[in-house]
């Protein structure tokens, strides 16, 4: 496969040698002066406990090694309290805490910003209870103050409160009230007051719950205008392929960003290939793969995570995030082993969205699921080469159809420029940086990673390829 790809690149180079190069210039015009970075949803394997398959030291070391390559700049970590601090009769902070401690120890040691939170209250009837607010904040303080996990910077009190699947069922007034109550409780703890703020509204872009007075845009607008306790704005997005590739998704993000005067991040992001009629071919393939699958029913999964094109779609989506002025995005999600649908514990219907399944052999009797999937590589490059504190910059140049790009100046003064060519034709690129190319390299992904020096900014961008120029 590698030899075939090299041959195709050589042929592409000959075919485009007489084609005028696409000039792309990195300017000093700033889109975002302090990008927070790209990251991943990494939840603490709550269901491994009832599955009777605790992660081994070997599993954890594998996770750490893969994450060290990725260098996520932030992690979104959400818990289900019935698996952790809620016993069914009361509250116990240290209950089943081994996994979340290992997860947060990693983030603390690597300086990774953590957005921590709860999917829902322990029971839906507890959603407004004083006991839950006190216990939830006490558990947060236990993590931050007593265990030293100061990497936790933001707190999500309800996951996707606009949704009809949430205990809030789109009730904005109730959510607003609860934000105030949680903030008042957090202010009682010195380790939390002024150190951890609330992230919200955590609403899903392009979704509207008929039971709610607001759609997602309305949720964000109402939060900006009426919920001053929120320290960082947080949304979720699951667009389709046409929506992203057409540029419409980026325009939606720009419209949302124009409403806010603080950083806004995507707490969850991924693709749903069955929401747009234009993606019908992908939808048909999706449901074909779901049929008879041994460990998912298709109710909450993405069967395309195994494909090379997903390794192009995900960084392409990130380019829309970065170029729109948003400040971060966390991919949903790191590992299939983190959740079953509805957190029911049913191994025949897991949320198959990950870069691998670390319990593929132990729980699912399929060791091949533990192998790294293609999109891990391109997402990792977008994490490690656009670190926190980078300036996202405007590009000048007329990019060809089916090619997208984003650029940044890093905190060390160097530059990173990423490209995705999701079309069927190769293109010669003539890239101009504000500095010389000494020490820079070109990394590409097309069914595998390749790396070589780039001395003058000129290179061929093959069809169906991700590329990044960086130090």
Where in the sequence are the language-model features?
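Solvent-exposed beta-hairpin/edge-strand motifs
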Residues: 434-449
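Aromatic/acidic polysaccharide-binding cleft in carbohydrate-active enzymes
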Residues: 271-380, 393-401
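C-terminal motif of bacterial Sec signal peptides marking the signal peptidase cleavage site
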Residues: 16-17
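C-terminal beta-strand-rich structural cap/linker in extracellular carbohydrate-active enzymes
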Residues: 455-471
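Substrate-binding cleft and catalytic face of glycoside hydrolase catalytic domains
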Residues: 67-242
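Carbohydrate-binding surface patches
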Residues: 398-436, 464
């Amino acid at each position: 496969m590698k030899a075939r790809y090299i041959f195709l690149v050589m042929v592409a180079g000959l075919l485009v040698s007489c084609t005028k190069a696409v000039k792309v210039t990195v300017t000093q015009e700033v889109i975002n002066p302090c990008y927070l970075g790209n990251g991943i949803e990494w939840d603490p394997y709550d269901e491994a406990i009832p599955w009777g398959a605790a992660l081994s030291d070997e599993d954890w070391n594998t996770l750490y090694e893969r994450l060290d390559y990725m260098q996520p700049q932030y992690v979104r970590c959400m818990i289900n309290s019935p698996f952790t601090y809620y016993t069914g009769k009361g509250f116990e902070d240290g209950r089943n805490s081994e996994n979340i401690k290992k997860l947060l120890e990693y983030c603390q040691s690597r300086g990774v910003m953590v957005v921590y939170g709860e999917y829902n209250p322990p029971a839906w009837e507890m959603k407004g209870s004083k006991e839950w607010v006190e216990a939830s904040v006490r558990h947060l303080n236990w993590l931050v103050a007593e265990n030293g996990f100061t990497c936790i910077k933001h707190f999500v009190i309800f996951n996707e409160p606009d949704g009809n699947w949430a205990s809030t069922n789109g009730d904005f007034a109730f959510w607003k009230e609860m934000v105030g109550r949680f903030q008042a409780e957090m202010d009682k703890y010195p380790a939390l007051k002024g150190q951890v703020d609330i992230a919200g509204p955590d609403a899903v872009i392009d979704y509207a719950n008929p039971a709610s007075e607001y759609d997602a845009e309305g949720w964000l607008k109402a939060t900006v205008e009426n919920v001053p306790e929120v320290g960082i704005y947080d949304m979720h997005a699951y667009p389709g392929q046409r929506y992203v590739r057409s540029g419409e998704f980026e325009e939606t993000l720009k419209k949302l960003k124009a409403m806010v005067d603080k950083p806004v991040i995507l707490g969850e992001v991924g693709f749903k290939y069955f929401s747009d009629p234009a993606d019908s071919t992908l939808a048909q393939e999706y449901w074909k793969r779901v049929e008879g699958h041994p460990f998912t029913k298709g109710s909450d999964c993405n069967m395309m995570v195994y494909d090379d094109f997903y390794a192009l779609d995900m960084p392409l989506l990130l380019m829309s995030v970065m170029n729109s002025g948003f400040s971060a995005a966390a991919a949903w999600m790191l590992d299939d082993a983190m959740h079953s649908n509805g957190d029911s514990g049913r191994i025949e219907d897991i949320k198959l969205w990950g870069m691998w399944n670390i319990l593929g052999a132990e729980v699912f009797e399929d060791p091949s699921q533990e192998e790294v999937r293609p999109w891990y590589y391109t997402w990792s490059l977008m994490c490690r080469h656009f670190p926190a504190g980078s300036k996202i910059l405007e590009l000048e140049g007329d990019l060809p159809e089916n090619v997208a790009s984003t650029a940044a100046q890093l905190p060390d003064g160097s530059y990173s420029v990423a490209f995705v060519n999701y079309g069927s034709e190769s293109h010669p690129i003539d890239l101009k940086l504000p500095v010389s190319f000494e020490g820079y390299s070109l990394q590409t992904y097309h069914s595998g990673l390749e790396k070589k020096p780039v001395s003058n900014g000129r290179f061929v961008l093959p069809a169906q390829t991700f590329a990044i120029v960086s130090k």
